[in-house]
Regions:
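A metal-dependent hydrolase signature that marks the N-terminal structural subdomain at the beginning
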Residues: 1-80
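A short mid-domain helix/strand-loop element embedded in enzyme catalytic domains
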Residues: 87-92, 118-127
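Post-HEXXH active-site segment of zinc metalloproteases
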Residues: 96-97, 106-110, 125-152
Length: 181
């Protein structure tokens, strides 16, 4: 299989599933972390799928990568405004490969797990509970911590296929990589 065919972006139906998982994840995290709709604005992030990624933001080794930028390309900041912008780079082809490889894994619960996991990282970075620039050992500890938080948040959700995803990834240690821009 060529690199081009392996890296096919999500189609319209898959994007709709992804949007649904983002909505549910944000709702769950809002309740858990007591984040109001207006407070979400201070968590400067975007979730992009493969078709909207730069070449450097694409990998075959993780479901997602988080890039930290000084600002969103869609924002104009005044000199007094600062803060990191986190770009969650979903790797459509890696997610799709996992769904095809395991018949018990479905796109919606898997994308819900991935998005929830990544947004927990963003919240932790924004609240300074974890440094973005950390050693490999610190990142590994943080991954374990975020996997545990994600599992705990999702374990009682009544979503078809989610128990299979939680079971499949219970021992997973790496979901993504972090890169300063």
């Amino acid at each position: 299989m060529t690199e081009h065919t392996e890296r096919l972006p999500f189609q319209q139906g898959e994007i709709a599933v992804l949007r649904q998982s983002i909505d549910i994840s944000e709702e769950l995290l809002s309740e858990h972390y007591k984040i109001s709709t207006s407070q979400w604005k201070r968590y400067r992030y975007d979730i992009q799928s493969l078709k909207d990624l730069q070449t450097k933001e694409i990998t075959d080794l993780a479901f997602a990568q988080i890039y930290r930028y000084a600002q969103s390309p869609h924002e104009r900041l005044r000199g007094s405004e600062t803060g990191d912008y986190f770009k969650i780079c979903l790797q459509d082809h890696v997610v799709r490969r996992a769904v095809k490889r395991d018949a018990t894994i479905q796109l919606f619960p898997l994308s819900l797990y991935i998005v929830t996991h990544e947004l927990i990282h963003v919240i932790r970075f924004a609240k300074f509970l974890q440094r973005f620039d950390s050693t490999a050992a610190e990142q590994e500890v943080e991954e374990g911590r975020v996997h545990a938080l994600t599992f705990k948040l999702l374990e009682n959700c009544k979503i078809p296929g989610l128990p299979e995803v939680l079971s499949a990834f219970k021992d997973c240690r790496t979901m993504e990589t972090f890169f300063p821009a």
